[in-house]
Amino acid sequence: MATFSGCYTALITPMDRNRQVDYEGLQQLVDFQIKNGVNGLLAVGTTGESPTLDWNEHTKVIEKVHEYSSNRCLTIAGTGSNSTQEAIDGTQHAHDFGVNCVLLVDPYYNGPSSLEIRKEYVEPIALQFPEVQIIPYIIPGRTGTQLYPQDLAVLHKQYPNVRCVKEATGDLKNMELTRQVCGEDFDILSGDDDKTYTMIISPDIAASGVISVVSNVAPRAVVDMVHYCLDGNEEAASVISQALQPLFNIVTVKTQEQTPYGPVACKARNPLAFKTLMNVLGMPSGPCRQPLGKMTRSGLDVVLINTRKIYESNPQILKPVSDYFGVDLKDRL
């Protein structure tokens, strides 16, 4: 079975002005990512707006990402659901098209226990598709539930195709326990860009890479940071990680907005800020589908201020965008 190592981009799904999938733009984004050295592409994760794509669109985007990549990198299909049968159907379709790796987010809203996630969700899929790599995706802040390390370890011991996790708990102790109970032959991928450096260099976590949002606009920098970490060059990796901090800051953008009845906290969550930034930079992106809307004026200011910091202090980070898409970033920012 494959070892998961490096940078895997959680690809956005570009839309046209009518909020229909822009497949020409998607092909450009796939090529841009591969030419900048990513190890793989996650199609239709949360960043790819899986909640608002119907399953016909969902499976077509997965097919197209796999087709466009032409086996130049790994395709990971986001086939998770809060319905096991739906996840099985999605995994079957991905497998039929030649995709042999899927990401299974913990079932959201209906909130099964960790035991149920193991026995009634991941296990049936791992059993039915032994030749497909299964990556559980642990993100309790979005799902309201969590597959715990102990149940993950049971899955890993019983099923050789469960040998990796996307870890987005934000809890370093949970990550350390995952390493402890799952062993050295289990791969941990960061699901939070701002924690990737720490997760890889920590000997008690020993992550091997990241499924990244930030690499949508800065693939080469994230690729290099991860490779330096894995090669033991922590100083070089730290320099890049610090340089990327302004982009880490905008994965989620928090502002306070005024209403006639007083101020309201506003949290623009991924992928809204990054799709907004990609529009600004001249990359294929388009709008998000409702109920995600538009950045507020103050939210857009946060995106622009942080991106200008990157452009002014470390212009090489965004240079692949200008080189590939032929845009003048100075004019756009």
Describe the function of each predicted region.
Residues 2-146, 154, 291-293, 317-333:
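Active-site beta->alpha loop and helix N-cap motifs at the rims of alpha/beta catalytic domains
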Residues 26, 62, 87, 122, ...:
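A general structural signal for well-ordered alpha-helical segments in protein cores
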Residues 30, 62, 91, 179, ...:
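A generic alpha-helix structural signal
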Residues 116, 169-170, 264:
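Active-site glycine- and acidic-residue-rich loops that bind
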Residues 124-132, 139-256:
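Catalytic alpha/beta core domains of metabolic enzymes, predominantly
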Residues 200-333:
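Structured C-terminal cap/extension of enzyme domains
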